[in-house]
Amino acid sequence: MRVIMDPLRRTLMTLFLFLFSFFISGTVSAQRIEWQSCMTSPYSDWFGVESPSPELLCGYLSVPLKYTDTGGDISGENIPFVRLAMTKLPAKSKHKGSLLIISGGPGLPGINPYINFDWPVTNLRESWDIIGFDPRGVGKSIPAINCQQPDGKRSENITDKQRILQRINACIHNTGAEVIRHIGSNEAVYDIERIRQALGDKQLTAVAYSYGTQIAALYAERFPSSIRSVVLDGVVDIDDLNDNFTWQLRQAHSYQETFDRFATWCARTKSCPLSSDRIQAIHQFHELLLKLHHSPLTDSRGESISSDELISLTTELLLWRSSWPTLATAVRQFSQGIVSNEIETALNSSIVSEEISDALGVILCVDQGDEQLTLEVRKSRKKALADAFPAVNFKRGLSDFPEFCELWPIHRDLNKTRLNNAVLPSGLLFVSHKYDPTTPWINARKMADKFSAPLLTINGDGHTLALTGTNLCVDEAVVRHLLLPRKTEDITCQGSGAGDTN
């Protein structure tokens, strides 16, 4: 069974017999990471069928489940620990420090992060340890968010609202209310500081991607003097944290803009039967979605391919310009009633795991304030979001039942935990594609202005690119900033698709 997530929340959202038995309790101070080879037990099963590099080291870092308002230890209490799964790829020669990779999501694992070490990125590999970690509640960190329900306990013939409430109850029961209360971005920021201290670095050197840029920017607000060099790629606007609807609406508009560019490219290259005319392309895509909705296709394993699968695949493949040919093939084949091995592979590889889906939903909801909407406001917002990204909203009529986060009972309201620090950090570099559907370029422009930091604009379509080896201009600028952080002017690099959609 494929796990399909709401397209506007994708890019945008063990039983608690743990009770704390999986925690260590005590006082946290100057915790160390006991590094061991990742080839040894219990770490060898962290990576599934993929064998890690023999050089890769693994370990856990214990951090407090909850912090004081300033990130300190809570005295007088026996505070349970969370154990963060960590990896280290040691520097090849003289060690100068650690480069921490902060993953996106929320909910994406971050151990053994992918970096292309071709030149110029190889310069980092020589003298910097590459550090990855699974954030609290995610992946191999303990405890992990778990919202799964045994098949026998999943009720049939219930309303959508009841189905959401069942999942919420499973999240809280399996993970524990106290764990969930401290699973959000507020604690994740303080975890970064504990990681820096455990690594023995005087200041933080890091690259953050997508949602990880939210953590990095909040860290820069709270610990400006602890920043050495931090690159934020695919930028979240932290000033939108007090207005969830605004960032959702901005993201929806950006997705539609990217769809329009995809359709124009598709028509020009004759890759799929979409028109370069915006209205006509949306109409054609709606016809295909309706066709799949009423008469789903079937893959070689007997799995159904409906409109939900195409929407999920579309929102996934629109993110990267290099994936557009695959999306075009899917649109063309589905229009013809065909499902090739290539598209089956794309559908299966784009599936979001249940664990990632759980973590994304829970962390987003915990971070949001307790927002109770009237029926009129809820309908108005849903209509605005549907109008902003009309390509995937083909069904007539909108449901009026509350969304997952509106029904979610445990909130921390991340915006209320922010610190107004008058000191601006140096050493930040913001990176963004000009046409990024999920973290729009305007986010990066606003954050660069807020922190008086340079902005690297990639003139093209995509989402996150730093240190992947696919754009020499970007990698040179990022590596230069990481090795020798200094205030520079804004930078522009040409990216995939620049100028070829018109």
Regions found by a protein language model. Name each.
Residues S295-S312, L319-S323, S350-D358:
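Structural motif
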